[in-house]
Amino acid sequence: MKKLLFTFLVIFLTSCASHDKQNKHHRTKITVEALQKDVVYTHKQLVKMHPDLYWYTSKEALDKKFDSLAQSITEPLTPNEFYHKISPIVSSVRQGHMSMNMFQLTSPDSLKKKYKGSTHPLSHFEYEYLDDRLFIERNRSRKDSILQKGTEILSINGIKPIDLFKKYRPTFTSDGFNETAIPYFFARKVNSYYVNELGFVDSVTIKASCADSVFYHTIKRTFKKSKRLLKQVEDSLQKNKIVDSDSLRKLSKKEQQIKRSAIKEQRKKQSFQKKWFGYDEKNKTYAKEVLFPVATDSTTAILKIRNFSEGKIKVYDTIFSVLHANNVEDLIIDLRGNPGGRLNDIHRLSRYLNDSAFVFTQPATITHRATYFNLLKGKSIPAQVFASPFIGIYSLVRGVSAKRNEDGLLQVPLKSSKYINPKPLNYTKNIYVLTDGMTFSAAAIISSHLKGRNRAIFVGEETGGTFNGTVAGVMPVLKLPHSKLKLRVGLMTIKPTQQTKEEGYGVKPDIYIKPTIGDFLNETDPALEYILKEIEQRH
């Protein structure tokens, strides 16, 4: 027993990262030999793990890029200087799920307690990047509401968004040759890019523009309040409360029981809705939501799906029950801004959108039978210890089930790669799908399925994810031995059954409508308005 406790103690202590050590590594120049070893390591791991490494670039071209990179390193570099050299090579594979992360500064060990739970000055903002201009899309801060939706960011601590875009654009990619995802990806990553440029700071000064006026605004880091301070606030409120509870009539035991039961029932309903529809506490939104855009007509409905990661997949029973109960004639599925999620989620959804048996995807392609053991790579020591038995069994079962197809590819059967029937509550009437450049991964696969089966009319932008599939599924994160940069790699090629001859591009809309800066500032939705007008004219 003592040996077991000692083992767990050692694991815990070795897993506790030193901030000072991390910051020192951030500033340390790594030797040429060590960096060249990281280049070789990255290349070897990609060849070993990635099932479609040469989908959009040839083996010869990629080999040459890695060789040239190794030869071009002639002086020591910091981890982030090295990042700007190796990440463009990784992004040249043109797989949007595969990415590298920079090495970030953090608080020193001496101030670890002070900064624990604090939030970076920019962490409350979400953005839109339109025509090389950065706008605030959402400000979640409760304390500082000066910068609201529509405010243009001209610079942060003197760094212009366009300069940031030019510097970091080579370091990330979408799937294939499609460029529609790039502005959306940049908008999602822009805070991390500014953090990398500015370092660990307590405040930033933003130069902004709103309603034709330019101004400067300083935002400070938010610190978590101490328990002592919270107690003082509670005591103050208690002393200054307007109504003394002793002056109110006390409820009888029966009334108290009725009140408790009502509160319990209400909380139960709220909990059910949040769990099943995937409630996001940070943004106060649901992953899946049914809306009726015309107040006087319930026959037109919008199914807004923000992601396929949150909520229960069985929620579609509830959703399509609502659609049937309202005799919905026209269903608008809004997949804009949807980065993807679970394969079993979109597979489940597809069963409500077809009227005959179908196969949703092809079997997944992997590099070798032991590929799933790579899931342990990049995990902390405690995670490896506790996860090893489960991942070991899972990897063994999946590896044994893999078989070679007629082209010699090693493929793993999926639930979605078998014939399946529609659900009893399947929707068979008119479907419109709204897409944009952030319709990615699983959201692009369900789009390919509906487009390939001529099941829907598509309106908006070309999807960011390609028509013919993606490399994702399970994605371990590797840590390069010397630079300590992190590399995420997809292990499974997942392709929809429906395919197109044009490789490297997304699902293209039947009606192309790209929102303008004016649409964003005026909060108008031309794509949705087009569909609603078409439905109105048809009726």
What does each model-identified segment do?
Residues A17-L331, L335-T365, I381, F467-K479, ...:
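Flexible, low-complexity junctional segments that flank or bridge functional domains
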